[in-house]
């Protein structure tokens, strides 16, 4: 038995209860239309008691279905056309909303059916002990997180709110008329709702309903504007903003507070002495109670300016004035304009003392609260003085201050610091990674003492594989232990414990990660857990850099010890969730050949049950395999990559090959690569199934020479595969998008090896791209050439040759390869004029080239019809040049503008 089959057998034994589809004889090749219909897992949930699991399966186009399973893996129920799904707090019910069928909706749209005549959603309340209730004509619903109650509205024109227990005991159902908004408290069955009232019984205003007692309380009467209605965690206190005059809310919002279900009282309003002069309560500022509910945080702002209604808009010039020395690029200002108009500055109301303290302002606008708002000090910061340099650095410096929540007094901690300060859970320390020296630091919030936790000589905190002309990033942190006693920091492989006061030596808690080249990372199973309990066993996920496989490990981090392997192998583990009250978990396991089906187990992973059977979708189709390969680059570096071979691979045959890549992807060897009509890349399964080999090589870069780095890494990898004898060297294509699109465009100027290239959203002119704008954020593009992905390490005037040598445009006359470009006119990442420069140059040179522009789409197609179209055209393009299939009409004759609304040219 060869090693390929040994590995496959080991995988099957590891996974356990697998469907035998992989052993079945498949005969059909995938089509693009098949990709659209194949289902993926788009959601999953486990009940708090660990007895039930729900999983949502969804095609890329069409209706989703939610399946319900018990602890033995038996499918109990199926809910077609499913959307949202939630288990109740008691684990006795599953609540599922259902949408109308897509085919029905589409047919009604074709008939131009009016909106009020279109079908509505439904709500299914399914009892896990048997029985179900269906609520038709659903408009919206909320399920209480900590109580078995649901609130909903139904009917397009009816705004009645219905609140009922999930047991369908309608004798305890409540109704409220003309409801505008409603929600449950996070950890109780308390519900608020805002109603316009009716003439009979219900006055307009804000009400509180205690579902446990049935008591309804009018918290605030009024038909004005209610905003930011917020419970504390337990639902005992309720805060909100209110404005009686709807047309003056921008300046007349007031803050109200209800305690223990009592009618609300106004606690802050315009003109409060604690506010800066001319400031008001912001309707956009988020309300937030501290954990103890002793503090209420809210937002203030300068009174918003109002437009001059006496001046006609047509009489006002619509000019933008860009200034060379303004800190924030005008395009960024314009992009963020609506956000800035809604900006608020945090203040706090001390509930017990009835005092207000303004914490943030226009000079120091960013704030971090410690201990969920209960710490005595918060962290204030601003990057405004340094915004200009971030335009080309890609990073920003900040000033940091402590601020007292009692009196608002401030103390400077650091100026012009590149570190991104964060707060420990209880707010005792600020901590950060300093990119400039690759070290971790803490700072005591109480006395301002700064401590250096790591040095480059003692701890490799940084990304050891950094290959951009900038400071390397950190590997991050696992979190803080209880009482802020220790900070757990990752290096490339292990988890280390550090004393935040730097009085004790650091401890490598996992010990063997670097030795075994396994990268250990803590798995957070409890979303509500703020700190790490070192005395409890912890689940770690490990990535093996040698095999590229994953594993789960058990560790007690109270002492240094090698983690205990629970399961590990040649697969990828993802999407783990734990039941709240038991040690049951659900997770997915996958490889390129193995669908990421959902599994159910306990935390020891001794027995795992496969719940879903998504792999059954593969049984009729030819499915490829993935293999790790290695070679030496032209500049002497060992590289890895993945070769994806057809299911019926025969080493004696010659296969067409597509090289598809970005930067480094060998670590995704066991990624299933869910079949789909991708927005930017080929679908590996589609091409494997149709007789293509796909090669995804790792690229490692030298500063200043990204194009040549790509050439030096990729070409010997391709040569290595050609040398194996099964590649048709006259039928090799290349495909990449964005950064990958740039690289394949560059390669076409350096070699005529490729018979066809698809280049998506490429940069071909580094000079003009440097001066462009990322319209999706307003940012200038200069930083990415000087410091990040484009890797030129200088400006066009300091290193002009680098810009020239790395720009495909200036050697386009050397291109001998037909090119398909995809670049959309609403691209917010790469200016689409780059695609135009590429196309115009190729057209001028008389070289075969086609360009796809999905009008109104961003960096890649997002509309499903456009993604399908892109995949079909790219598939036809490669099939023509690599498999000698007939040229489709859109390539041979084009699609003239006057024909475009009617013809696709397939």
Q: Model-found features: residue ranges?
A:
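Cap/lid segment of the alpha/beta-hydrolase catalytic domain
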Residues: 456-468, 605, 613-731, 735-737
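Active-site-proximal cap/loop segments of hydrolase catalytic domains
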Residues: 674-906
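Beta-propeller folds
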Residues: 16, 23-584, 590-596, 600-601, ...
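Hydrophobic/aromatic beta-strand patches that form the interior of the parallel beta-sheet core
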Residues: 357, 379, 599, 629, ...
């Amino acid at each position: 038995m060869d090693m390929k089959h040994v590995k496959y057998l080991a995988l099957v034994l590891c996974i356990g209860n697998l469907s035998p589809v992989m052993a079945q004889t498949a005969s059909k090749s995938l089509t693009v239309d098949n990709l659209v219909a194949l289902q993926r897992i788009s959601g999953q949930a486990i009940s708090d008691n660990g007895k039930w699991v729900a999983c949502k399966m969804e095609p890329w186009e069409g209706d989703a279905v939610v399946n319900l399973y018990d602890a033995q893996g038996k499918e109990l129920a199926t809910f077609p056309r499913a959307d949202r799904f939630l288990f109740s707090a008691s684990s006795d019910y599953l609540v599922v909303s259902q949408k109308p069928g897509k085919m029905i909706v589409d047919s009604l749209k074709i008939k131009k059916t009016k909106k009020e005549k279109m079908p509505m959603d439904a709500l299914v309340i399914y009892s896990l002990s048997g029985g179900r209730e269906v609520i038709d004509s659903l408009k919206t619903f909320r399920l209480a997180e900590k109580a078995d109650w649901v609130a909903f509205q139904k009917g397009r024109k009816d705004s009645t709110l219905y609140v009922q227990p999930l047991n369908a005991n309608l004798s305890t159902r409540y109704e409220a008329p003309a409801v505008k908004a409603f929600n449950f408290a996070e950890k109780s069955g308390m519900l608020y709702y805002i109603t316009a009232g009716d003439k009979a019984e219900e006055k307009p205003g804000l009400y509180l309903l205690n579902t446990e007692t049935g008591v309804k309380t009018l918290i605030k009467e009024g038909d004005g504007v209610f905003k930011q209605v917020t419970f504390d965690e337990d639902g005992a206190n309720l805060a909100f903003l209110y404005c009686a005059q709807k047309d003056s809310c921008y300046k007349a919002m007031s803050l109200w507070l209800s305690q223990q279900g009592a009618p609300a009282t106004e606690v802050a309003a315009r003109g409060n002495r604690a506010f800066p002069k001319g400031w008001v309560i912001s309707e956009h500022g988020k309300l937030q109670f501290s954990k103890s509910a002793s503090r209420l945080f809210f937002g203030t702002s300068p009174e918003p300016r109002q437009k001059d209604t006496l001046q006609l808009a047509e009489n006002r010039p619509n000019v933008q004035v860009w200034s060379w020395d303004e800190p924030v690029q005008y395009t960024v200002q314009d992009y963020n304009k609506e956000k800035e108009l809604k900006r608020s500055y945090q203040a706090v109301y001390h509930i017990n003392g009835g005092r207000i303290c303004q914490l943030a302002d226009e000079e120091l606008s960013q704030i971090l609260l410690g201990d969920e708002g209960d710490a005595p000090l918060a962290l204030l910061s601003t990057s405004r003085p340094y915004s200009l340099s971030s335009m080309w650095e890609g990073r920003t410096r900040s000033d940091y201050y402590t601020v007292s929540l009692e009196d608002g007094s401030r103390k400077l901690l650091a100026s012009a610091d590149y570190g991104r300060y964060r707060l420990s859970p209880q707010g005792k320390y600020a901590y950060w990674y300093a990119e400039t020296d690759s070290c971790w630091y803490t700072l005591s919030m109480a006395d301002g003492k700064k401590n250096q936790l790591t040095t480059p000589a003692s701890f490799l905190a940084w990304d050891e594989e950094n290959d951009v002309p900038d400071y390397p990033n950190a590997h991050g942190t696992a979190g803080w232990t209880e009482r802020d006693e220790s900070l757990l920091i990752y290096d490339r492989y292990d988890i280390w414990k550090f004393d935040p006061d730097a009085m004790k030596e650091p401890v490598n808690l996992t010990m063997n990660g670097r030795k075994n080249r396994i990268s250990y990372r803590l798995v957070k199973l409890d979303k509500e857990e703020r700190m790490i309990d070192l005395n409890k066993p912890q689940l770690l996920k490990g990535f093996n850099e040698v095999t590229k496989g994953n594993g789960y490990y058990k560790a007690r981090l109270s002492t240094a010890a090698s983690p205990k392997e629970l399961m590990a192998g040649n697969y990828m583990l993802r999407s783990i969730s734990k039941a709240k009250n038991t040690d049951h978990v659900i997770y997915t396991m996958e490889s390129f050949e193995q669908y990421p089906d959902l599994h159910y187990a306990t935390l020891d992973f001794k027995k795992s049950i496969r719940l879903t059977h998504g792999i059954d979708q593969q049984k009729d189709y030819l499915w490829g395999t993935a293999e790790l390969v290695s070679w030496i680059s032209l500049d002497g570096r060992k590289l890895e990559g993945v070769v994806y071979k057809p299911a019926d691979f025969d080493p004696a045959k010659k296969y067409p090959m597509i090289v598809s890549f970005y930067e480094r992807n060998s670590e995704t060897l066991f990624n299933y690569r869910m079949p789909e009509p991708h927005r930017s890349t080929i679908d590996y399964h589609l091409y494997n199934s149709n007789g293509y080999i796909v090669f995804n090589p790792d690229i490692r870069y030298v500063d200043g020479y990204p194009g040549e780095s790509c050439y030096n890494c990729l070409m010997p990898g391709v040569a290595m595969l050609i040398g194996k004898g099964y590649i048709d060297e006259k039928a090799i294509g290349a495909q990449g998008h964005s950064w990958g699109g740039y690289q394949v465009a560059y390669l076409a100027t350096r070699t005529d090896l490729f018979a066809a290239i698809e280049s998506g959203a490429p940069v071909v002119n580094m000079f003009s791209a440097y001066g462009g704008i990322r319209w999706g954020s307003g940012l200038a593009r200069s930083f990415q050439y000087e410091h990040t992905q484009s890797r030129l390490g200088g400006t066009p005037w300091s290193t002009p040759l680098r810009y020239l040598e790395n720009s495909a445009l200036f050697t386009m006359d050397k291109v001998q390869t037909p090119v398909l470009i995809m670049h959309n006119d609403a691209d917010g990442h790469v200016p689409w004029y780059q695609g135009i420069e590429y196309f115009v140059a190729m057209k001028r040179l008389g070289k075969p080239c086609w360009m796809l522009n999905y009008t109104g789409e961003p960096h890649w197609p997002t509309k499903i019809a456009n993604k399908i179209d892109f995949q079909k055209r790219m598939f036809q393009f490669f099939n023509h040049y690599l498999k000698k299939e007939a040229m489709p009409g859109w390539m041979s004759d084009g699609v003239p503008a006057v024909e475009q609304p009617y013809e696709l040219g397939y």
